[in-house]
Amino acid sequence: MKWIAPALAYLAVGLGILQFHSAWGALVGFHIVIIISLLIARPNIPLAVLLKNTKRKWIVLSILLCGSSGVALYLLWDTFGFPNDLPAQVKALGLTSSTWIPFIAYFALVNPWIEEYFWRGYLGSETKMLHVSDLVYSGFHALVMIGKVQTGSILFGLSMLVLAGWFWRQIAHENRGLLAPVLGHMMADFTILVAVYLNV
């Protein structure tokens, strides 16, 4: 079950984006699949680990480093080769003037808790080397990026996400908790989505 769960998460995102053309459907479906998988697996990881942190410096570093990702995306927007019809593509996914703000709020405030418990908690590892969970975490984002940026930008984005997964996994191990990764993930999600919102 442990490694079936990511496959089901990929399926949920793929169906939401590619079949039903719904950003909300992809995100909520992704979360439902993860939560059901965790309820079935019943990992011996207390939810309190999401609030655990032993060294404040990791929170600060995680927030600053990950928050800079959206700032960099905004400042370097033109270098990533976004198509001229990106606003239309985004609108076709159901993200309009009335739904963007709630989507950003839900994505930034809810998603990091679910993802960090799943990827760095349930599927995580204490190895300092790259782990398969880093790669699998990165990979599903390709389903969101395909058709919206050039191939080179997709590969760059996936590489950065592998590093982000590895980084969050390391600070989770150092802190014996997931609060620093959650807050960094939260800042990354928020700033990246705001950068997209401001450009479409």
Model-derived features with residue positions:
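N-terminal, membrane-interfacial amphipathic/helix-forming hydrophobic leader that caps
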Residues: 1-56, 71, 190-200
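A residue-identity detector for tryptophan
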Residues: 3, 10, 24, 58, ...
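Juxtamembrane helix-loop-helix connectors linking adjacent transmembrane helices
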Residues: 46-111
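Helix N-cap and loop-to-helix transition residues
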Residues: 22-23, 55, 96, 129, ...
